[in-house]
Amino acid sequence: MTEFFADIAPVRYEGPDSANPLAFRHYDPDEMVMGKRMEDHLRFAVAYWHSFAWEGGDPFGGQTLIRPWHPQDDMTRAKVKADAAFEMFDILGVPYFCWHDADIRPEAATFAESLRNFEEIIDHFLAKMESRRTRLLWGTANMFSHRRWMAGASTNPDPDVFAYAAATVKTCLDATQRMGGQNYVLWGGREGYETLLNTDMGRELDHMGRFLSMVVDYKHKIGFKGAILVEPKPQEPSKHQYDFDAATCIGFLRKYGLEGEVKLNLEQGHAILAGHSFEHEIAVAASEGMLGSIDMNRNDYQSGWDTDQFPNNVPEVALCYYHILRAGGFTTGGTNFDAKLRRQSLDATDLIAAHVGGMDICARGLKAAAAMIEDGGLETALRDRYAGWDSDHGQGILESDLDSLFARVLAGEIDPQPHSGRQEMLENHVNRFV
C-alpha cells in the first residue's frame, strides 16, 4: 500500500443529512432506480489522466501538485502511481476507470521501448484487478501531446506519422482487449488545423476516414467485442477540430460508411465549447442510435475555457440523464469523470472529495431524471405537441407533394393557427424534480 491515501477510509453512503465531507449523501450503489441498481445505471469511471497524470500546470504556470510518483519518467514510479490509483478506486468503490497510454507508462526513446513499458504496466494492472472489482471502461491513445502529433495523427501531412498513429492505436486496442475494456475511444485533439493556408481539408478528412476504417477492421480481426467511440470537440488544442460536435461526427461517420460501427463519447465541456448544452449533444446522438458513453464535467461559463471541473449543477445533470434514460440507458458506456482538481487543491482528500461530490451530483441527477420519466408529464406534453402528425391528416401531408399542398392551401382548406409551446410551464415542471 502507498502512503498517499493511507489515512482515508472507504467512502460509504450515509444519507442526505450526513455532514461527513467524505461520505455519499445521494449515491447509494444498491438503491433501485427504475428497476435497476444505481451503480448499474451510472457506471462511474475515474479518469487516470486527470487524477494521476496531471501535475497542476496551466498555460501560465507549471506543476503545483506533488505526488509520490513524480517525476513520471520511470517504470518504478509508474507502478507506484498504479498502486495509488487502485487504492483510490477501492476507496470510492467505482466499477471502472479509463486511461490513455501516455498516462500510465513513461515515454521511452523508441516505439519498441515505450511498448515494453506499456505492456509491463498493463500486466501490473491485470495483477491488481485479480483481487479487485474495478474494471476498464475504455482505453485510448494520446495522440496530441508529443511533438510528433503537432500537425495531427491520422490527418498529418506526413504519411509516416499516420503509420506511427496506426501502430499506436493497435497497441492500445490490444491492451484494451486484454483488460476486458468495454469500449475504445478516439479523440482527435490535433485532427484539425491551425490555418487553412497549409491545409488540404478534403484529403485530411479522407485520411481520417480511412484511419477509422482501419481501426474498425482491426477490432473485428482480433474479436474485440466492445464499442468503438469517437469524441467530439470543436477546438482546443487545435483552432478547428474536424470532430466539431455530435452532428458533425455523425455526418462524418455516414460519409465513410461507419455509422453502423462507431458511436459517440460525449463530454459536457466539449458541448459547451461547441455552443451547445450537454443534453443537446446527447439528444442528437440518441436520435441517431449513436449514443455510446459520456465524460462528465463542467466548464467555467464566464471564461469560456475548457476547465474540466467536477460537475455541481443538478438541473443540468438531470436533463442529461433524462435523455440517456429515454434512449434506454448505457450498454457498454458509462459516466467517466473527465475532471481534474483545481491547481490549488493539493491534497489526497481533495481528490476523494471531488469524486464524492461528482458522484453525488450524478446520483441526484439520475434520480430526478427517473422521477420525470415515471411522472410522464414531459412525454405527455411532447406527445400532445406532435399529435397532429399522428393523425390521418398529418400523415396525408407527409405523403403528399408540393402541387397538392399548394392547391389545398390556396383553396383555404389549410389555414394553420399557432399553438403555445408552453416552455415556461415545462420549465416549471422540471423544477419540481430538481
From Swiss-Prot:
Keyword Cytoplasm among UniProt keywords: yes
Chain's gene name: xylA
Organism, scientific name: Ruegeria pomeroyi (strain ATCC 700808 / DSM 15171 / DSS-3) (Silicibacter pomeroyi)
Classification lineage: Bacteria, Pseudomonadati, Pseudomonadota, Alphaproteobacteria, Rhodobacterales
Protein name stated in the entry: Xylose isomerase
HAMAP family for this protein: Xylose_isom_A
Co-factor: note: Binds 2 magnesium ions per subunit.
SUPFAM superfamilies, per the entry: Xylose isomerase-like
Subunit structure: Homotetramer.
Broad enzyme group: isomerase
